Amino acid sequence: SSTETPPSYNQLNYNENLLRFFNSKPVTAPVPVELDPPKVESSYVSSAREDARSTLSPVQGFEGSGGSGSSGNFTTGSNLHMSSVTNTSNAGTGTSGTGNSGDGGGGGAGDGPGSGAVPPVTLTESLLNKHNDEMEKFMLKNDRESRGWSGEKNKKSANDTLKMVEYSGPGPGHGHGIKRGGSHSWEGEANKPKQQLTLNAGGMPPLVDIHASSSSLSKCQTSVAGGGGGGGAGSASGTCGTGNNGAGGGGGSNAQSSTNQYTQSGLSCTQNINLWPPFSVGITTPTSVLSTHMAVAQSSFSPQHSLFPTFYYIPASIAASSPASGTSPNPRPHKHTHVHPSSEQPSTSQGAAATMPLQYMTGVMYPHPSLFYTHPAAAAATAMV
């Protein structure tokens, strides 16, 4: 990024330093104090160098050494001064630089690029610092240009990405794409409360708010009017949503036929249960008890397509009707024992469990019939009533 500190000169010049160092074929062995050439060469070359050093002139001795170091006949001061230059220069140019520097005392002979006509420049600290400053400016300029080019490339790619996003945005042809869970849909259904059945700590489903389904209640009351009145109410509440055989005359037969159709058809029974309001069961009259049961039966024949999460279950008619028929064989007291406690206790969970069928989780289709059992609490409430 542009905010970071610029790299130092050593970092920028690292690769060039490595390349220049290995091109100079440096002497990696420890150099003795008298600056003799290293003894890693062959015996023939070393003996020839010793002979040349003892017999030849300084220039010729430098030629015989192959340009790999300064001559042994130089003074100690010149050797110390020129060691850095000769060790970092091109090592193979010693032979071409001979014969031109015999009068200079051998100082810097053979150090040039091969021409020998240009006099060697004496390296000083100020000259090296000046060279370093110039090279640092040059390297920083190259680094800035390279980073600027990469920054422009990144900016161009970012602009292309933004254009692609704009082109592929929600248009007339892109109305329905992949919708993730929890995202706002275009139909405005982002924050609607979900409606489903949840089991409480006792294993029973929450009590149903009867006043929330007024339309289904009105349908049920019209169907109950032709059914025979209070007799059907006794049979419906006593059998936990399945109906007794002929209990209460005409009303009982009506409830029996409707629940038998509901049991045989197995259609989806959807109930609009809101999770947010507190639980309230407003059972006041036997008519409301009957209409609550009939709402479950009638809603199966009038499917409500507006509610999406539906649940499928088969009521266990045998398990629910056996304890009720065992405790009250006479149908006439059977009617009275069910109508009055339900009206006397309008808000108890036992009465609601006795009048409401057991329901399971929404959106889940239970495939095996053994899963559809009557909860022990519901069976106990039915037996107690």
Curated annotation (Swiss-Prot):
Residues 340-351 have a biased composition (Polar residues). Residues 28-121, 169-189, 322-351 are annotated as: Disordered. One of its GO terms (cellular component) is perinuclear region of cytoplasm. The keyword Repeat applies. Essential for biological clock functions. Determines the period length of circadian and ultradian rhythms; an increase in PER dosage leads to shortened circadian rhythms and a decrease leads to lengthened circadian rhythms. Essential for the circadian rhythmicity of locomotor activity, eclosion behavior, and for the rhythmic component of the male courtship song that originates in the thoracic nervous system. The biological cycle depends on the rhythmic formation and nuclear localization of the TIM-PER complex. Light induces the degradation of TIM, which promotes elimination of PER. Forms a heterodimer with timeless (TIM); the complex then translocates into the nucleus. It comes from the Eukaryota. Phosphorylated with a circadian rhythmicity, probably by the double-time protein (dbt). Phosphorylation could be implicated in the stability of per monomer and in the formation of heterodimer per-tim. Keywords: Biological rhythms, Cytoplasm, Nucleus, Phosphoprotein, Repeat. Residues 71-93 have a biased composition (Low complexity). The gene is per. GO terms for biological process: circadian regulation of gene expression; entrainment of circadian clock by photoperiod; negative regulation of transcription by RNA polymerase II. Its main location: nucleus. GO terms for molecular function: transcription cis-regulatory region binding; transcription corepressor binding. Residues 94-115 have a biased composition (Gly residues). The keyword Protein transport does not apply. Disulfide bonds: none annotated. It is found in: Nucleus; Cytoplasm, Perinuclear region. This is Period circadian protein. Coiled coil: none annotated.
